């Protein structure tokens, strides 16, 4: 039965008028042999969008004595009000604030792991426990001040931990020791 259905389907023909046959190209493989007009892509860099000739070259950061750390480290040091707004953003996203400090290396270095990436050999010490249930940025800033008093020569960062997804969502340096 199946062979008779298969053979009858193989000999079936479709009658088309010449106008219909020329309208649509036969489909072979993954691409049609005759399709829409192809647009030619210009790889010339001068054809890219322009700002009207007002190009200004930006200065690159010096490579010596300008270590960069994490998020927001390319900005000037944050004021207390700016830190409070960052912590408020963290709390509004339902992330758990936590403070961490590092007394030796607050920047990327390769001691335990040689490949670049997120896990770059830095291990920070947690200041107390994560602040579950914290609703006020002032609480976090008070803990930051306590940590600064205890470890004045340490780098201190604030992280935001999403307890639902169980990932760290934000991390930024809140305090750098003198000379950095």
From Swiss-Prot:
It holds the Pfam family RbcS. One of its GO terms (biological process) is reductive pentose-phosphate cycle. The keyword Plastid applies. Residues 1-56 form a transit peptide. Its main location: plastid. Keywords: Calvin cycle, Carbon dioxide fixation, Chloroplast, Photorespiration, Photosynthesis, Plastid, Transit peptide. The keyword Plastid applies. The basic functional RuBisCO is composed of a large chain homodimer in a 'head-to-tail' conformation. In form I RuBisCO this homodimer is arranged in a barrel-like tetramer with the small subunits forming a tetrameric 'cap' on each end of the 'barrel'. Heterohexadecamer of 8 large and 8 small subunits. Belongs to the RuBisCO small chain family. RuBisCO catalyzes two reactions: the carboxylation of D-ribulose 1,5-bisphosphate, the primary event in carbon dioxide fixation, as well as the oxidative fragmentation of the pentose substrate. Both reactions occur simultaneously and in competition at the same active site. Although the small subunit is not catalytic it is essential for maximal activity. This is Ribulose bisphosphate carboxylase small subunit, chloroplastic 2. It comes from Spinacia oleracea. The lineage of its organism: Eukaryota, Viridiplantae, Streptophyta, Embryophyta, Tracheophyta.
């Amino acid at each position: 039965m199946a062979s008779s259905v298969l053979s009858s389907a193989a000999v079936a023909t479709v009658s088309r008028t010449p106008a219909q046959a020329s309208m649509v190209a036969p489909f072979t493989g993954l691409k049609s042999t005759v399709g829409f007009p192809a647009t030619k892509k210009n790889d010339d860099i001068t054809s890219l969008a322009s700002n009207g000739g007002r190009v200004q070259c930006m200065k690159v950061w010096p490579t010596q004595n300008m270590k960069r750390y994490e998020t927001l480290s390319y900005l000037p040091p944050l004021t207390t009000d700016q830190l409070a707004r960052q912590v408020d953003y963290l709390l509004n996203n339902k992330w758990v604030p936590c403070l961490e400090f590092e007394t030796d290396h607050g920047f990327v270095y390769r001691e335990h792991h040689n490949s670049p990436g997120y896990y770059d050999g830095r291990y920070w010490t947690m200041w107390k426990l994560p602040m579950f249930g914290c609703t006020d940025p002032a609480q976090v800033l008070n803990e930051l001040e306590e940590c600064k008093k205890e470890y004045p020569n340490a780098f201190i960062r604030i992280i935001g931990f999403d307890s639902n997804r169980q990932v760290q969502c934000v991390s930024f340096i809140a305090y750098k020791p003198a000379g950095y």
